[in-house]
Amino acid sequence: MGLQAPRGTRDILPAERVYWQYLETIARQILDRAAYREICTPIFEQTPLFERGIGEATDIVSKEMYTFRDRAQRSLTLRPEGTAGVVRAYIEHGLHSQGGVQRLWYLGPMFRYERPQSGRYRQFHQLGVEVLGSADPRADAEVIAVALDILQALGLKQLTLMLNSVGDREDRSAYRQALVDYLTPYKADLDPDSQERLHRNPLRILDSKDPRTQAIVKEAPRLLDYLSARSRAHFEQVQSLLQALGIAYQINPALVRGLDYYTHTAFEFQDMSLGNEGTVCGGGRYDHLVEELGGPPTPAIGWAMGLERLILLLRDRPLPARNQPYLYMVTRGAAAERQGLILAQQLRHQGYTVDVDLSGSAFGKQVKRADRVGATVCLVIGESEATDGTVQVKWLASGEQVLVPQQELLSENWRSRFLTPHDGLLSH
């Protein structure tokens, strides 16, 4: 067997990449309107960043990180998520000293050693936002609203917003003990992962997918019942704001998310068409993470979307039609090939997409290839056209065509003509 992409990774070929480009364009437009600014951080970071930021007891840190030593024996890790790197950059570059609230977004590959399955890979891509510097419940409502705007703009129809509060540290400490006390008598009946988590990270047992564990957890104490008055007030304000924005939600007391840094609001968007793996966006508030990583006390909230899962949904839907013509240059003969190359470059400078057939194959095959790649218009320069300085313009959908001087195509009149043939100009 020859060389292949490593297990858990995949190539994104051009036919699929158009869906990624569409997704990225939609996201950029919405994030720009909401005044979020893009940030890019390294693909690998110092390992302690994730150990301290995500939590050593989490599955991500204990089981799933790609960690290695460089030639100077420094421990480095391919980023398993985006928030820790953004927070590190926020601290390192003193963004907090600029005052006000920082609205940031990122997009890029992440890495986790997981069992590959549909929509889940060891190299995967996330779109994420972080709002740093605001404890206001309006920030919680805003990031949820922005996420919903993106998902709805992509055409997702079966969305459900799951909402919970994980409280502050004191709330969780009291609840953690109550949960351990409840689960300990059932330890032998829990799935192996939950047994391991019982004293290390018991809150993660709440989102176990094992049916027997789920049945036990169903009767467990609820974290919502252990919230302080302050935590409860924050959560109630978030709910009130979501209602004011017309955003429906369901309270899910078992929703805790998989990272240790979350406080107060935790949420997920699920798309039911993806079944049990239906989470397409998840996030929450992390009011202590900046301080824990060496920065000043800074409340913050954010979310991340798994793009592979969104692409699974997008590929079942037609993309919006192109509003720009896709021109395909077909030539025969040395003079025509030269003129075709020059004309194509001139048209590209005018803003058109122009594909030049470089195969040297027969005329008919070149025209068939134009149709196969999705071109809207075929530009044909044969030997006679090369002699006359003309070009045949052929609309592939209708088969209509017209002979015009090559330089006429550079006029503004042709911007609309390329999209729709004009009666009176056509020869058949």
UniProtKB/Swiss-Prot annotation:
Q: Which residues form a coiled coil?
A: none
Q: Which reaction equation describes what this protein catalyses?
A: tRNA(His) + L-histidine + ATP = L-histidyl-tRNA(His) + AMP + diphosphate + H(+)
InterPro entries listed in its UniProt record: aa-tRNA-synth_II, aa-tRNA-synth_II/BPL/LPL, Anticodon-bd, Anticodon-bd_dom_sf, His-tRNA-ligase, HisRS-like_core, HisRS/HisZ, HisRS_anticodon
Q: Which UniProt keywords apply?
A: Aminoacyl-tRNA synthetase, ATP-binding, Cytoplasm, Ligase, Nucleotide-binding, Protein biosynthesis
Q: Which Pfam families match?
A: HGTP_anticodon, tRNA-synt_His
Instruction: Provide the E.C. number(s) assigned to this enzyme.
Output: 6.1.1.21
Q: Which residues cross the membrane?
A: none
Q: What is the protein named?
A: Histidine--tRNA ligase
